[in-house]
């Protein structure tokens, strides 16, 4: 067995151990960041003055700080919880800010006539968002 064969075996073993954890991390972060983005983006598109400013600050801060710094901050400050869930929390918060801006942009791109049509039909806000927008 050559050195190259040993290296290939070691790399395959490491990939076999790390790949399931990576896929779990991706799935959990995607789920939570989508949830954060949809909820906060919908709230932000309603343009409630104080809430809009707070969420705008959240978006600016989370998009301005590198993800690795957020990971290190949460890892150093949160002593309870596993490394996996600390990683999920920090990545989801950062990516949730990006998703929030995407959802907000989607709401703002809807034509004003569609909002007025829903208002003329006297649809509740949730029905307007689900069925019209």
Residue ranges and their predicted role:
Residues 1-133:
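Transmembrane alpha-helices and adjacent helix-loop boundaries
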């Amino acid at each position: 067995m050559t050195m190259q064969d040993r290296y290939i075996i070691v790399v395959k073993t490491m990939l076999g151990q790390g790949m399931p954890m990576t896929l779990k991390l991706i799935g959990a972060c995607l789920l939570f960041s989508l949830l954060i983005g949809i909820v906060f983006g919908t709230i932000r598109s309603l343009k409630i003055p104080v809430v809009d400013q707070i969420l705008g600050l959240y978006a600016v801060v989370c998009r301005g700080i590198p993800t690795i710094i957020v990971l290190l901050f949460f890892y150093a400050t949160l002593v309870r919880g596993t490394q996996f869930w600390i990683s999920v929390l920090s990545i989801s918060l950062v990516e949730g800010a990006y998703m929030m801006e995407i959802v907000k942009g989607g709401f703002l791109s809807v034509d004003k006539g569609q909002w007025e049509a829903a208002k003329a039909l006297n649809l509740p806000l949730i029905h307007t968002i689900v069925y019209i927008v």
